[in-house]
């Protein structure tokens, strides 16, 4: 049953596990100093990742939305990627925050869960994965084998979500490090604001920002949106 309470709870657990794995890879790369060299905006964030403890990463992973992205807002990219997959075409890949064999299983599971949500929980897939409605439709049409091939061909498209918003990441790690649940809830609110802006831009509509006066955003609130 679409959007049943059990389905949403299971999806939230899945999202948290994906976030944990993604953050662990990001922290490992930050400690090795071989990540984000070309992203000057992340210079201030790398120290937070490099010294993050397991408990800090675990708390940060509680964000009710995926902290990973695979061009989920780029309708044109997905249309071209699917066509290229069928034709065998290739193009030059852009620099990614994730690389190496460890990223492939993570990207595969991210896309598989996004595909599953697009097919059975389409009304919440935009919130949880940040998918534009048209991307949701495209992903839902794929087969598991299509996903396997796409991951291998386009692994470098796996990126941190809101990669160009370093302030969000700084707020997230500060709140997770300080063991401050109220600050974490404010970060969740920031997530919703960023998501609202993304969805509004894909539809060509102005976005009215959510204000703190509406109360803190918890996982249950985000799930019910």
What are these regions (language model features)?
Residues 103, 107-156:
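Amphipathic alpha-helical packing elements
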Residues 61-113:
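Aromatic-anchored, charged helix-turn/loop surface patch used as a conserved interaction hotspot
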Residues 29-36, 117-121, 145, 153, ...:
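Surface-exposed polar/charged interaction patches
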Residues 44, 146, 167-168:
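Exposed alpha-helical structural elements
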Residues 1-84, 222:
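Structure-specific DNA junction-binding interface
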Residues 4, 15-19, 96, 100-103, ...:
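Intrinsic-disorder-associated interaction segments
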Residues 172-225:
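Short, functional C-terminal segments
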Residues 57-72, 153-194:
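Long, compositionally biased
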């Amino acid at each position: 049953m679409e959007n049943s309470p059990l389905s949403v709870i299971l999806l939230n657990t899945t999202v948290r596990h994906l976030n944990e794995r993604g953050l662990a890879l990001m922290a490992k790369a930050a400690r090795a100093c071989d990540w984000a060299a070309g992203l000057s905006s992340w210079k201030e964030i790398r120290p937070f990742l490099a010294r993050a403890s397991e408990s800090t990463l675990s708390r940060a992973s509680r964000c009710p939305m995926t902290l990973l992205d695979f061009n989920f807002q780029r309708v044109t990219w997905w249309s071209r990627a699917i066509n290229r997959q069928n034709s065998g075409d290739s193009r030059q890949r852009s620099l990614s925050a994730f690389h190496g064999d460890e990223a492939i299983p993570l990207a595969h599971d991210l896309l598989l869960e996004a595909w599953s949500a697009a097919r059975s929980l389409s009304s919440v897939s935009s919130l949880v994965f940040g998918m534009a409605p048209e991307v949701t439709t495209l992903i839902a049409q794929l087969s598991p084998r299509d996903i396997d091939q796409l991951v291998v061909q386009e692994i470098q498209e796996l990126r941190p979500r809101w990669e160009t918003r370093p302030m969000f990441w700084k707020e997230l790690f500060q709140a997770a490090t300080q063991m401050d649940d109220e600050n974490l809830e404010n970060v969740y609110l920031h997530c919703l604001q960023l998501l609202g802006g993304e969805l509004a831009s894909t539809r060509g509509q102005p976005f009215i920002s959510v204000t703190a006066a509406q109360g803190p955003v918890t996982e249950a609130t985000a799930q019910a949106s």
